[in-house]
Amino acid sequence: MRTGLTRLAPALAAILLPVLTACVSVGIGTDVPLQAHYLLHDAAVPAPRRAAPVVAALSIQALPADATADTAAIAYSQRANEFAYYQFASWTERPVRRVPRLLQQRLEARGVAGAVGMVGEPVRADWLLTLAIDTLHHDAAALPGQGRVALTAELFDRRNRTRIARRQFVATAATASADAPAAAAALSQALTQVFDRLVPWLETELQQAVVAPK
């Protein structure tokens, strides 16, 4: 009996080793044994502040997000319309909450409005910007892949309940490797690119709306 177990040991080890290795994987073909948390951030160099705000106040409302953004898990996709999540890597905060706050900080730093608040905060604003995250994931169809972010922004005039403008912003940033740390870094870069396009668009739309005939 002992001889049989001795013979089985190498075979069992050969079977179990790949399984145990897969259990600690947080990358596509990469092994990192510890749980890691990543901060989604705006990597832009602060832009010069406007001499004067375009409007007195602006409110931001986060709309329901795509499933890839309504979870703390970091999503990746190797095939179209099919997603998975890194097992031992996550965001410090769900993107559906984090992204609007980051945009608020960018708009405040730029001085687009005298006050920028989230819906529900004590800020009275005639202008409302809604923000929907259409996707936020590591596109790994061709390794090492790229971070892909898509946001849809809509600007409303609350005084007459009309939509002023609507636009989707999409950006990608190459990942340095096919793993969670590189995916998190690339997604922050892609989000920064989206903000770089969204903020000038918003300024222009607000400027035109302010001077438009009532």
Give short role names for the model-derived ranges:
Residues 24-48, 110-160:
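Surface-exposed short loop/turn segments
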Residues 60, 103, 131, 151-153, ...:
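Buried hydrophobic packing residues in well-ordered domains
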Residues 19-22:
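C-terminal motif of bacterial Sec signal peptides marking the signal peptidase cleavage site
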Residues 54-56, 70-72, 79, 87, ...:
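Envelope-exposed proteins and targeting segments
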